Amino acid sequence: MEPRTLDLAAYPRRAHFDYFRQMANPYVSVTAPCDITALRRLTQERGLPFFLTVLHCAINAANAVPELRQRIRGEGIVEYDRCLSSHTVALPDGTYCYCTLDCAQSLGAFLPAAQAEVARVKAAPSLDDGADPDELFFVSSLPWLTFSAISLPTPTPADSNPRITFGKFTQEGDRVLLPVNLTANHALVDGPHLAAFFDGMVQRATHPEEYF
């Protein structure tokens, strides 16, 4: 998927782009509890894989925010029509490998294809991000911990791939809450864009049957 190049002369955040690019740590990171009660119920009732169902929800919420599909390339900005996910897959020896998935299909079509791809990469594990790492959302999961903040390793110089991390969900009364972290490069992404991701994820998790 070849991205389009943005016209920086018409880009409304040009000053902010230049400002945050100068910083040693240009990342902004927000963790929020997402209500996944209905989504969790759907996975239980239909016997669906929980992580992959949450992944599909999150990646489609991220793809609905144009700023999260933008990447810094050289001195400019490119924007993808949609981005793929690259998530960690646990291996029997305690390490992990990466698995790249396209979440554009409906949930019902996505899950069997995703399960097959996870099985394939576990048989031949690799940390290769593929031909175009820029088109990826980096996704991790800490199902052992319910966290309220997280710090992630990032490269130098800074990249511009958003990072999404899930924690251990908790039951609070009749609600199921999942801690979700979104880390993004502030040269491209501001507070309203972060909020749009979380709003989109909760909306999808509240009505998961609409995306099946």
Predicted regions and their residues:
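Helical lid/core segments from catalytic subdomains that handle acyl or acyl-like groups
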Residues: 91-147
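Hydrophobic/aromatic-rich structural module bridging two neighboring secondary-structure elements via a short loop
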Residues: 63-100
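Short amphipathic C-terminal alpha-helix that caps PH/PH-like domains
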Residues: 58, 111-118, 197-205
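Histidine-centered acyl-transfer/condensation active-site motif
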Residues: 131-144, 162-198
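Gly/Ser/Thr-rich phosphate-binding loops and adjoining beta-strand/alpha-helix segments
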Residues: 3-6, 21-53, 69-83, 158, ...
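Acyl activation and transfer enzymes in specialized metabolism, enriched
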Residues: 39-64, 178-197
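Flexible helix-coil linker/hinge segments at domain or subdomain boundaries
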Residues: 204-212
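Acyl-group handling in specialized metabolite and lipid biosynthesis
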Residues: 28-32, 39-45, 94-108, 189
